[in-house]
């Protein structure tokens, strides 16, 4: 699948969704256009931390809250790092063909709006759906709705496992749904690529702006649900190119990457457990990372407390003393304000165990408050 073809497909998907005839906006049970949205107002402050000098251009003590979008909190209250608003529209072109677009504005970007989703969707039959265009890269269990803070208990999904340099992709995917002996089955396979200029995550690790490309993307996932249990397994492979905008240095160039992931979630009456495990393997560069999280909580009327433990560790035999290694704990309290809004308070303790040759963010404690809503 060539970049030119992907650009053409993406433009077509966006145009199909935006070129809606006036009659589609009329109210009624059979509206062709469906609109929805979400918003999060998040404030955070690092209460204490080990590092006192700046981390690149960021004041410390500091805490990385969103790797994928380069959001980092410092020693004063900040509201732009994770605050965001998004609007999504789906237009039914025919009973089987639809177009979807989603625009998101993030405070960390200066509230610049970006087209996060833009795809055409065709229902082949009751089991199969084919989609073409721009979507969220399905690395993690919460990837598809990670931006919708109202959809989960935390202020943010655990950062030790959630967050990588590429968030979206342009391509094609096919989704299969069925029931296997009492198990609800959902499976997805996809192909595509993504080009990220001035990559947001890499500005946390480099002084110079970096361009990152994930090409020859191929992957799939399988979600099984039965009763109290939901499980998910995923596999993704691709080639990685990274180049400095300043001097053209490649790091890496065409390196092969494999991603493996497992998740298992349980809901037993008021109690619930959330767990996830992921591996990123770039063996050609002797790089491999492992991360996991496990959390548990309970629902007590409008209140939902939750405790979560996380861990992340890299391996690199070329630079064994410059690996990132950390673990963390978070305590979250969610309060339901109504049918579509929730208030959350979260305390995070990040323990930096990185190698002596890596100058990282250091151990820190973060307090954050979020107001999440959907509409």
Segments predicted by a language model, with ranges:
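Bacterial N-terminal signal peptides that target proteins for export
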Residues: 1-10
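N-terminal signal peptide c-region/cleavage motif recognized by signal peptidases
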Residues: 19-22
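Transmembrane beta-strand segments of Gram-negative outer membrane beta-barrel proteins
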Residues: 26-67
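Outer-membrane beta-barrel pore domains
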Residues: 27-29, 121-123, 143-145, 151, ...
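Outer membrane beta-barrel
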Residues: 32-34, 42-44, 73-196, 223-227, ...
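Extracytoplasmic loops and strand-loop junctions of Gram-negative outer membrane beta-barrel proteins
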Residues: 67-72, 102-103, 153-158, 202-206, ...
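Residues that define the transmembrane beta-barrel architecture of outer-membrane proteins
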Residues: 75, 79-85, 112-116, 166-170, ...
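Loop-centered beta-sheet repeat module
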Residues: 194-242
């Amino acid at each position: 699948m060539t970049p030119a073809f992907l650009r053409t497909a993406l433009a077509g998907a966006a145009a199909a969704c935006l070129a809606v005839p006036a009659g589609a906006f009329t109210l009624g049970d059979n509206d062709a256009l469906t609109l929805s949205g979400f918003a999060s107002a998040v404030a955070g402050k690092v209460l204490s931390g080990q590092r006192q000098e700046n981390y690149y251009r960021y004041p410390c003590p500091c805490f990385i809250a969103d790797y994928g979008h380069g959001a980092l909190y410092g020693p004063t209250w900040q509201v732009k790092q994770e605050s965001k608003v998004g609007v999504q529209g789906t237009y039914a072109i025919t009973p089987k063909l639809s177009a979807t677009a989603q625009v998101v504005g993030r405070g960390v970007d200066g509230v610049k709006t970006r087209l996060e989703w833009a795809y055409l969707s065709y229902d082949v039959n009751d089991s199969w759906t084919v989609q073409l265009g721009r979507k969220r890269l399905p690395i993690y269990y919460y990837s598809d709705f990670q931006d919708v803070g109202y959809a989960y208990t935390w202020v943010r999904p655990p950062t030790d496992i959630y967050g990588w340099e590429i968030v979206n992709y342009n391509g094609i995917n096919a989704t299969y749904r069925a029931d296997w002996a009492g198990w609800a089955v959902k499976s997805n396979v996809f192909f595509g690529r993504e080009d990220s200029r001035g990559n947001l995550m890499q500005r946390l690790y480099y002084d110079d702006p970096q361009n990152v490309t994930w090409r020859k993307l191929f992957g799939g996932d399988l979600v099984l649900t039965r009763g109290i249990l939901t499980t998910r397994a995923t596999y993704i492979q691709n080639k990685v190119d990274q180049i400095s905008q300043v001097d053209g240095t490649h790091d890496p160039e065409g390196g092969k990457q494999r991603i493996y992931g497992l998740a298992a979630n349980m809901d037993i009456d008021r109690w619930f457990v959330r767990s996830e495990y992921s591996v990123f393997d770039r063996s050609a560069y002797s790089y491999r990372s492992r991360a996991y999280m496990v959390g548990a909580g309970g629902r007590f009327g409008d209140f939902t407390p939750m405790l979560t433990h996380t861990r992340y560790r890299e391996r690199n035999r070329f630079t064994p003393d410059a690996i990132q290694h950390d673990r963390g704990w978070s305590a979250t309290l969610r309060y339901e304000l109504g049918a579509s809004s929730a208030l959350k308070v979260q305390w995070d303790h990040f323990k930096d165990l990185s190698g002596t040759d890596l100058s990282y963010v250091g151990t820190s404690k973060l307090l954050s408050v979020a107001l999440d809503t959907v509409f």
